[in-house]
Amino acid sequence: MVSTAQGYKCKFFTVEPIFFNGQRAEQKVWDAVRSAFNDRENCLCFWTYPVFIKDKKICFEPDILIVDKELGIIVIEVKNIRINQITHIEGYNWFTQNFFKSPLNAYKQSKNQLHQLINSCNNYPLLKQKVKGRVLVALPSITESQWTRKGFSEQLCCPPILFQEDIDRDNLIQTIVQTAGQVQPGKPLEDKEWRLLQKIICGPVLPPIINEEGKTFNPLPPRRQVIEKLQQWVGSTDIEQIHIGMSIPPEPQRIRGIAGSGKTVLLCQKAAWMHWYHPDWDIALVFFTRSLYDQAVHLVNEWLKFFSNDEVEYDPETSKLKILHAWGDDRQPGLYSTIHDTQNISLIHDQRVKGNPPEKLAYLCKRVLSEYQIQPIFDAILIDEGQDLALDEQQLKFEDKQSVYWLAWQALRPVAPDTPDVRRLIWAYDEAQSLDALSIPTSKEVLGAELSQILGGNGGAWYEGGIRKAYAMRHCYRTPGNILTAAHAIGMGWLRPEGMLTGITNKKDWEHIGYEVDGDFRKIGEPITISRPLKNSPNPVHHFWSGDLLEFNVYDSCEAELNALREKIHQNIHCDGLKPSRDILVIVLGSQEESINLQKRAAQTLQKYGVDFYIPSALNSNQFPEQMDLQDKRPNQFWKEEAVTVSRIYRAKGNEAYMVHLIGFNNIAKNESSISLRNQLFVALTRSKAWVSLSGVGEYPMCEEMRQAIKNGNTFTFNYKKPLGRVIGEEILT
């Protein structure tokens, strides 16, 4: 039998490590299931899986749930009861002594759980009456001979049972199939049916796309056709994402993921799952980009509805799960303002706090940590966009730790009274999307040198029970592969004549973000080939569109660039069938002053030619937020119906569109050695779900670098030079 979590394949899911009197018995059955199904393809196995019984409005948890392409759904209810604790049996009721419950009806309980899952499958015509349903009761502390001697096997209502010796046998799968009670007959599933079953078990099934009222095209323009195909595309279930989204770690957890890998969706799922599983917990889901608020609320609500079979919806006013911007203000609470207000904190400022928003926040967090003893108010905190809360300046850190993270840590209750240094802080990040700093929220930066050993050191990569301490997400679902590789190449400077500015310098870390590497990083000047397999960029747009997905144009003047922009957007709306809002996004590149000026000029150009624009945080379309009173602004808003959003990069983070227009490339190219400016370009390129149109004014050396990055596609070869700026990477435990 395989004895370690590392030895098992990723098909096994521990929802939460649990510690109770019967745990050893459940663990024994779970270990036997994992050993038996370890080499079996097309199956998923869960240790505890909440099932909501809608008509009774209660939630049950099958101790072990097996979902198999050939065998269907199997529910195993484990009872750690000994033979002398069962006094007599009447029907399916077991009357007990010295046990926590009497009578016991394990079979009925497990059948109810299975019926709910089978009914969910039967709601879909593709699966109706096709998924086999089986149920068993496992008694790991009772042998078959003990059961027989008591006369229980002669009962007419004796349920199908896995006895102690069955669990220890090598042919457990055969025993389960022969023993289990069949609740619904069925058949082995076809590939399409199996994919749908996985979606039903692991996440919301996407509803069919309904054409909206408005302009209709007959036939559909090519780009509109592509979008509709992409909307109907449902990729195969990502086993790693199920692990991340449906597990509750007993201690800190770090999630490193490339742009478009689904970090935000997964953190919303994880927060909703934790809230559903532990409704008494105080949980905070924290993010940096304020325009993500509505998206986060929507995603959390959708996941809660899924977990509760549409019985529970998210109510920000009453829920113990709080969705918080990192800052917060008088109109909407954030992480800092919530801690500030609940602790009666009053900081006296001798002078105005200086710096950009992350620096100001870190400064205030450090002062709070230095001057106050923080009382814990949360049971779990999940942080998205973690790279934006990590700062370079030592004076903004608290001791050797990032101040914002350490304030969050102090606001957490210990997982258990006897482990005061064990707390549930979960953070996700992509170092390539950092816009203001080069620091990376590694475990050492977040927790300090001593506590960071929780995620490393002698403890290994797994917590007890089989939940990983850290993840690296390598699949990009949003951005097409060639756009992503071009974004990484230009963002890190792979093709710079002087050598890359920033990047990863070992094969293992490249593999963790989905690349294959040929070459030796230890040899300066040696050729390195980096390629990205299609399997790690599953967006299928290249199957539907034969033209360029990423185009780059240079114009003689800003006026020419903006005229080309409005012509392309006019084409997108009136000929390509794209909706102004959410299908199209304009992102302005450059420093704060440059991007503000160019944003205004671009918006005015669109309006002049009859295209409504929307500037994020404005009240209405065709308005500029800086001309509005504070109370009239909508800081959470990023889109406006029937208007094209024109955004600077800081507001655009976390958002996406099918057609992304990037303007102001020259603002990056004239200062091409700036890592933060190149990161702007990376973030902007990876907002796309299909196409990018990139443009700038005037020729710069970086223009040829951009053209070459586009030309190279998914494979790049360059002579390695040690990065001039920073080295990206942190040990990802295996």
Regions found by a protein language model. Name each.
Residues 47, 75, 135-137, 285, ...:
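Structural beta-sheet core signal
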Residues 442-485, 492, 498-507, 521-522, ...:
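Core RecA-like ATPase module of SF1/SF2 helicases and allied nucleic-acid translocases
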Residues 71, 80-83, 141-144, 290-293, ...:
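Conserved nucleotide-binding/hydrolysis micro-motifs of P-loop NTPases
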Residues 219-236, 240-258, 265-476, 480-498, ...:
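Alpha-helical nucleic-acid-binding subdomain
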Residues 1-224, 228:
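Intrinsically disordered, low-complexity Ser/Thr/Pro/Gly-rich regulatory segments
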Residues 68-71, 77-111, 130-132, 143, ...:
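Conserved P-loop NTPase-based nucleic-acid remodeling module centered on helicase motor cores
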Residues 108-109, 115-130, 277, 306, ...:
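Arginine/glycine-rich "motif VI" loop of SF2 helicases in the C-terminal RecA-like domain
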